[in-house]
């Protein structure tokens, strides 16, 4: 191919993966490709989410110098409020919203609802009173990490990284900024910049995984447009 894209978490550059990755890229380079490698943060490309990913682009050496350039970061960061505040509350009974697919509230225990009620937007488990902390979290997050679990998203900042388990309030800062619920599957998809009418197939866990594992649409578009520019130069 004239070009290829590889995307992964920054951990691919860690101790366990770095040698394997760079050995593979060296072989690709030897076979006739320029290799471009950079960490991009989705929030810089129209995604209301903090999401750092390694994006590697291969460009076949049909010319003397490489033509590809990474997209330039945008100045404006889209906040959670800008992205999802317009959505109505999902039904109390856990059913889908009648006009918005996958917009429903998860069932939460009384204790998890109490945890949400104790938090302000942007706060995680470090702000919970002792009686609402899970036993495994009674040690400071400075020691064991995971400070954002059992958290509410901020309104006026980007969201944390949407993971494959963002549908669970216990797995991260996935509580709605002001309503006492975790964000819906549709809200997660919007924070990944999928169109509101995008159709996902599967059960709740499968759809959450599809959304959380996806490359955010707006970031993919930004990189894709740069590849198109590169190919246009190539053909001219």
Task: For every predicted segment, state its role.
Residues 1-143:
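Class I S-adenosyl-L-methionine
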Residues 103-236:
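C-terminal target-recognition/interaction regions appended to catalytic cores
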């Amino acid at each position: 191919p004239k070009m290829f894209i590889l995307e992964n978490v920054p951990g691919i550059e860690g101790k366990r993966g770095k040698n394997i990755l760079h050995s593979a890229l060296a072989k690709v380079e030897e076979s006739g490709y320029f290799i471009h490698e950079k960490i991009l943060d989705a929030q810089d490309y129209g995604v209301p989410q903090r999401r750092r990913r390694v994006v590697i682009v291969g460009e076949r050496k049909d010319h003397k110098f490489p033509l590809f350039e990474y997209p330039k970061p945008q100045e404006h960061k889209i906040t959670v409020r800008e992205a999802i505040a317009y959505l109505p509350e999902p039904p109390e009974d856990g059913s889908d919203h009648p006009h918005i697919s996958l917009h429903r509230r998860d069932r939460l225990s009384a204790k998890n609802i109490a945890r949400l009620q104790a938090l302000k937007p942007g706060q995680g488990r470090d702000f919970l009173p002792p009686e609402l902390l899970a036993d495994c979290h009674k040690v400071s997050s400075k020691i064991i990490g995971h400070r954002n679990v059992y958290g509410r998203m901020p309104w006026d900042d980007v969201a944390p990284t949407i993971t494959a388990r963002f549908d669970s309030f216990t797995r991260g800062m996935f509580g709605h900024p002001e309503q006492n619920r975790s964000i819906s599957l549709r809200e997660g998809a919007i924070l990944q910049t999928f169109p509101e009418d995008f159709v996902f197939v599967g059960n709740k866990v499968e759809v959450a995984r599809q959304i959380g594992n996806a490359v955010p649409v707006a970031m993919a578009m930004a990189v894709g447009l740069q590849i198109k520019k590169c190919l246009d130069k190539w053909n001219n």
